[in-house]
């Protein structure tokens, strides 16, 4: 086919969609170019046949940033790109979330999306271009997909309002970083962090983005009209109405009763018994459905039972109404040797969160397309299998753990002190020890508590809450503090974190169409009510940061020296600073402007290092008495060391009021003596006196 190109204006940028020139053997391939800044190649391949052994939709999204795109060669021994970075993993999730619900229910063919950043000027983030390209590639692929989608990034400034698709520079000055994706009539995904914006401002940003990305959807439709392949012939399997009716008739009441058991493990055990009974009764005989089909039908009855109960106003699975937060149990300082710790329990969800303070050298080094930079704040989330009572794989963090950790990080980062106020590197680790819904928001609450327990001067405490939705026709119910089952069986996962003043993070994933502005308003309102409730209970335990750091935390001393003294502190080949660090057991970081940060495992170590630096950088003061060591004796006097690297001359005439024939009659090398600084000339030479010390002391020097 001949290349097809579509151009359109999107905010302050011109976007070009091109297909038919590159990657023509893929089901769909689109090269997206934004101005001359970013080019992303997006390919989509769909398997023509489903794998009968997979009981789920095998969609995979891979976003990758090639270093050649920015004119760089990878570091390391092999000089090629390795495992996905955290940024690549997070962007892959960002693309996956809005497209997954648009594939038809029951579609089980494998689909793989690969987004490759092939060129960038390092001015803007390529993620929006990748999302637009994914929408376009799916639209022309012929794969069953109820799109296209649009996507946009929104920034906000009090004076100028909302800004579409900001550059990195514009984003740095913004109080909001929000990515929104959706179809022409519905929002499907929101990912954001903010600096205490109001609920109305956050909702306004979502609606602003939805209006603005309609131009993307229209452009993709125009591209598909010219370049799309024929849509696959695919139809869902017919609904097993007889099987569903049989299960509901004989086991419906028992299933409904099982969902009144409030303890998760007991509920799952009872449902497991019922599932086994249903499979034993309705499968296995000739002419009966397979066990897999019966289990699927049983799951459908579970789905309908829970949803019908909720929209009809019945109590939720654990007996709560739609607005109640589960009981909280909050502890701080639970681990005696850590710098700060908290145990946050909400119902059957529990997070053990630990804060650790380190030096500037402990900051995470990030090698990105934009260049190397250091991140002084890390938040890591771990979800071991025992937290849900299962055996499972133990190892490195998966995509879900990276995503949840980043959400928790977004939630608290705006409330951390500035680096010039608190120059420590901070690492927070959230260990999920129990899970039944919203462990990421438990991590937010636990992180805020642990940081305050560690003495990090937080601007305000932060709490988070997960909201859910069940919508059947015109009926709907917004749920506060959802359980794991309500997340799985519901239509929305809506997480809000913030302070008493405003929102610091908002994440939303919608599984259905038709989420209205009214529903989002209600969800934000209920989330605010719940957040204030949780903050109130947190404040009863610890309402503000401790005034002193933990005794286990390193001591930091900040000081500043003249820039021309930096080389004296460092010494030849770093010998001086290395000796100070080795002898005092402290670490020293020196900036080009003369700023020095000294970190010691103890206060004594840090102070010892500070005194050494002061000694090197101090200047001899005229009229001040020093205790010095005689370094060298000459015929006309003696050279006395009064400060590190600074010797002064005591002339023979300044040794004593009496006449001195030989200097060695008064002094010997290595002797400690008191000397008075008489003068420092313009070449830095120091003139000393011994005979004037007594008079200077008498005058009060």
From Swiss-Prot:
For the S1 motif domain, which residue ranges apply?
623-691
Q: Which CDD domains match?
A: KH-I_PNPase, RNase_PH_PNPase_1, RNase_PH_PNPase_2, S1_PNPase
One of this protein's GO BP terms?
A: mRNA catabolic process
* Catalysed reactions listed for this entry: RNA(n+1) + phosphate = RNA(n) + a ribonucleoside 5'-diphosphate
Task: Enumerate the InterPro entries for this protein.
Answer: ExoRNase_PH_dom1, ExoRNase_PH_dom2, ExoRNase_PH_dom2_sf, KH_dom, KH_dom_type_1, KH_dom_type_1_sf, NA-bd_OB-fold, PNPase
**UniProt keywords, alphabetically:** Cytoplasm, Magnesium, Metal-binding, Nucleotidyltransferase, RNA-binding, Transferase
List the EC numbers from the record: 2.7.7.8
From which domain of life does this come? Bacteria
CC cofactor = Mg(2+)
Q: What is its main location?
A: cytoplasm
Q: Where is the KH domain?
A: 554-613
Q: Does the keyword Ligase apply?
A: no
What subcellular locations does the record give?
Cytoplasm
Per UniProt, Mg(2+) binds at: 487, 493
Q: Name one GO molecular function term.
A: RNA binding
Q: Identify the GO cellular component terms for this protein.
A: cytosol
Oligomeric state and interaction partners are given as: Component of the RNA degradosome, which is a multiprotein complex involved in RNA processing and mRNA degradation.
The record ties this protein, via PANTHER family, to: POLYRIBONUCLEOTIDE NUCLEOTIDYLTRANSFERASE, POLYRIBONUCLEOTIDE NUCLEOTIDYLTRANSFERASE 1, MITOCHONDRIAL
Q: Give the family from UniProt.
A: Belongs to the polyribonucleotide nucleotidyltransferase family.
HAMAP family per the UniProt record, alphabetical: PNPase
Q: What does this protein do?
A: Involved in mRNA degradation. Catalyzes the phosphorolysis of single-stranded polyribonucleotides processively in the 3'- to 5'-direction.
Q: What is this protein called?
A: Polyribonucleotide nucleotidyltransferase
Organism for this UniProt entry: Pseudomonas fluorescens (strain Pf0-1)
Q: What is the lineage of its organism?
A: Bacteria, Pseudomonadati, Pseudomonadota, Gammaproteobacteria, Pseudomonadales
């Amino acid at each position: 086919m001949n290349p097809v190109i579509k151009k359109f204006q999107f905010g302050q940028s011109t976007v070009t969609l091109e297909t038919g020139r590159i990657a023509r053997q893929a089901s769909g391939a689109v090269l997206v170019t934004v101005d001359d800044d970013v080019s992303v190649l997006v390919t989509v391949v769909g398997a023509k046949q489903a794998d009968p052994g997979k009981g789920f939709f095998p969609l995979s999204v891979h976003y990758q940033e090639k270093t050649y795109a920015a004119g760089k060669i990878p570091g390391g021994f092999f000089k090629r790109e390795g495992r996905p970075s955290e940024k690549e993993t997070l962007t892959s999730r960002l693309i996956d979330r809005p497209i997954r619900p648009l594939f038809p229910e029951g579609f089980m063919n494998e689909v793989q999306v690969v987004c490759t950043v092939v060129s960038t000027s390092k001015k803007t983030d390529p993620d929006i271009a990748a999302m637009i390209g994914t929408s376009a590639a799916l639209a022309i692929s012929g794969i069953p997909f109820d799109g296209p989608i649009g996507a946009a990034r929104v920034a906000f400034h009090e004076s100028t309002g909302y800004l579409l698709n900001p550059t990195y520079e514009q984003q740095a000055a913004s109080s909001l970083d929000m990515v929104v994706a959706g179809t022409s009539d519905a929002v499907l995904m929101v990912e954001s962090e903010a600096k205490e914006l109001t609920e109305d401002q956050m909702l306004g940003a979502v609606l602003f983005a939805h209006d603005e990305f309609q131009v993307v959807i229209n452009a993709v439709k125009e591209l598909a009209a010219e370049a799309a392949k024929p849509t696959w012939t695919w139809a869902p399997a017919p609904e097993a109405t007889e099987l569903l009716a049989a299960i509901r008739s004989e086991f419906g009441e028992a299933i409904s009763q099982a969902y009144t058991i409030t303890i998760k493990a007991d509920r799952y055990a009872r449902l497991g018994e019922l599932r086994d009974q249903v499979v034993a009764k309705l499968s296995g005989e000739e002419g009966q459905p397979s066990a897999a089909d019966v289990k699927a039908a049983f799951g459908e009855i579970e789905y309908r039972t829970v949803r019908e109960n909720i929209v009809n106003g019945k109590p939720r699975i654990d007996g709560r109404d739609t607005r109640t937060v589960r009981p909280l149990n909050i502890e701080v300082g639970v681990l005696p040797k850590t710098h700060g710790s908290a145990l946050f329990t909400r119902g059957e969800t529990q997070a053990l969160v630990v804060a650790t303070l380190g030096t500037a050298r402990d900051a995470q080094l990030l090698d990105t397309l934009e260049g190397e930079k250091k991140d002084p704040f890390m938040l890591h989330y771990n979800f071991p299998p025992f937290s849900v009572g299962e055996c499972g794989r133990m190892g490195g963090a998966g995509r879900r753990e990276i995503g949840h950790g980043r959400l928790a990080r977004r939630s608290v980062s705006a409330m951390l002190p500035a680096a010039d106020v608190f120059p420590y590197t901070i690492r927070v680790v959230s260990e999920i020890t129990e899970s039944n819904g919203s462990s990421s928001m438990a991590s937010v609450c636990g992180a805020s508590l642990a940081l305050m327990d560690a003495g990090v001067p937080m601007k305000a405490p932060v709490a988070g809450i997960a909201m859910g939705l069940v919508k059947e026709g015109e009926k709907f119910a917004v749920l506060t503090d959802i359980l794991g089952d309500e997340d799985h069986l519901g239509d929305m996962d809506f997480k809000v974190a913030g302070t008493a003043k405003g929102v610091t993070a908002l994440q939303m994933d919608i599984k259905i169409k038709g989420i209205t502005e009214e529903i989002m308003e209600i969800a934000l309102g209920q989330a605010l009510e719940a957040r204030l409730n949780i903050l109130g209970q947190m404040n009863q335990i610890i309402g503000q940061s401790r005034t002193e750091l933990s005794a286990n935390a390193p001591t930091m001393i900040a000081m500043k020296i003249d820039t021309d003294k930096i080389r004296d502190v460092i010494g030849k080949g770093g010998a001086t600073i290395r000796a100070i660090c080795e002898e005092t057991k402290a670490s020293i970081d020196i900036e080009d402007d003369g700023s020095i940060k000294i970190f010691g495992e103890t206060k004594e170590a840090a102070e010892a290092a500070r005194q050494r630096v002061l000694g090197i950088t101090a200047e001899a003061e005229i009229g001040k008495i020093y205790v010095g060591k005689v370094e060298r004796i000459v015929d006309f006097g003696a050279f006395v060391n009064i400060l590190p690297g600074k010797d002064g001359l005591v002339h023979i005439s300044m040794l004593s009021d009496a006449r001195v024939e030989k200097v060695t009659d008064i002094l010997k090398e290595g002797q400690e003596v008191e000397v008075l600084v008489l003068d420092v000339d313009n070449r830095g030479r120091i003139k000393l006196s011994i005979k004037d010390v007594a008079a200077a002391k008498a005058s009060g020097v």
